[in-house]
C-alpha cells in the first residue's frame, strides 16, 4: 500500500508550510470532487520514485487542565493509529512548550515510528533552542526549514529507509494478474463477498462501523489465475465520524485505489445508494480505475423492489453508465462467479495498447460521422490522435481551437472511441492539446483550413 505520513504538532509550528513543501510537485489525487480537492490538508507526494500520501492533522490546542483529552481530535487519533510514520513538528524559534511535551507523550503511546522535526531552523536564535528538544525522549531531532527546504531530504531518506517497500511477494503476484479493490460501506456484505470470492472461510475483518484498520492484501489463485484482493475498511456515515476520521478513511481508500487494477463497489440492495457510495465511485473515476458495481442481497427482493433499485442505480450512477452491474447474493454465492468474467476482461482492456495508425483511422471515421462544430465562423479541427497511457487508457488529441470544443462533442468522442476500440466498460481519459500535428511532414504554411 502507498505509505501515509502524518504531520502532527501544535498550531503555528509550520505544518502547513511543510505540507506544501512535500506536495508542491504533485497534483491532487482527485480533481473537482467537492469535499476532497478543497480540503488542503491531504495530498500526494513522491520521493526517489516512491509515492506516498501526506496528511496535515491540524494543530493540538490543549484546553487548560484537560490537556490532550479535549484537544486530541478524531483526525489526530487516526493519524496515530493509521499512519505508517509520524512527523512531529516543533518550533525552533519558540522552543519547547508544555503542549509539545503532552503531544510527545500521547504519540509514544501509539507505538508508531515518530520523527521529531525541529522546524524554522533558519530563524534568528533558533540553534540555541535545539538542546531542549532532546528532553522529549524521541531521539535525535531532524532540523529543517520547511519554508526553504533545508534538511527535508535527509528526513525523507530516514523515513523511507525505515519503511518497507511494496516490492514483496504480493506485488510480484499482482504483476501477473489483476489487483482487485473491494470497496463499500460497512455491513453491505463486503467481507462475506471477499470470503466467497477467495473460496474459503476466513475472518478478514474488524469491519464494524467506526473501526479503523489498514487495508488487507490477499494474494490467491482461481482456476490457475493469480489475483490480489485489496480489502479496505468500509466508508462510514459522516454523522458517526469526525472530519479527521473521514479524511483518513479517504486516504486509505485513495491508497487502495491507486494500487488497484479493478474496483468492485459493493452496495446493499436494501439500503440503496448513499452519498458515500457515489463519493467512492467519483474517486475511482477520477483515478481512472475500471469499476464493477456489485449489488448484494438481491435474493428475497420482490420484482417491484428490484425495479426500484435498478432505477436508482441508473439515476445516481449515471456518470458511469459504462460500468458493468451485477446482482448477487454473497452469502449464498449466487452470481459471484460471474464477477470474474468482468474482472479479467477489464484488466486486459485497461492495459491495451493501440497503434497511432489505428487511432487515427478511428478518428477519421468518427469525424466523418459527426464533424466538430463551427466556432466563430471556423470549424474546430481534430487533426491527430495518439495513446498517452494505460490504466486508464488515455487518448491525446491534437488540433486547432480545441479549448473551445464543447462538452457534448467530447462526450460524443468518448462514446464513439469506446465503440471503435471495443472498450465499452473501461474508463477513457481524453486529453486535448492545442497545436499542429508533430508527425505531419507538411510545413505549417501548407495547412488546409
Curated annotation (Swiss-Prot):
Q: Which GO terms describe its biological process?
A: ribosome biogenesis
Residues that bind GTP 2:
184-191, 231-235, 296-299
Keyword NADP set for record: no
An example Gene Ontology molecular-function term:
ribosome binding
UniProt keyword terms in alphabetical order:
GTP-binding, Nucleotide-binding, Repeat, Ribosome biogenesis
Record domain EngA-type G: where: 3-167, 178-351
Q: What residues does the KH-like domain cover?
A: 352-436
Binding positions for GTP 1 per the UniProt entry: 9-16, 56-60, 119-122
One Pfam family of this protein, by short name? MMR_HSR1
Q: Which family does it belong to?
A: Belongs to the TRAFAC class TrmE-Era-EngA-EngB-Septin-like GTPase superfamily. EngA (Der) GTPase family.
Q: What is known about its subunit structure?
A: Associates with the 50S ribosomal subunit.
Q: Quote the NCBIfam families the UniProt record gives.
A: GTPase_EngA (TIGR03594), small_GTP (TIGR00231)
What this chain does, per the entry, is described as: GTPase that plays an essential role in the late steps of ribosome biogenesis.
* Name of the featured protein: GTPase Der
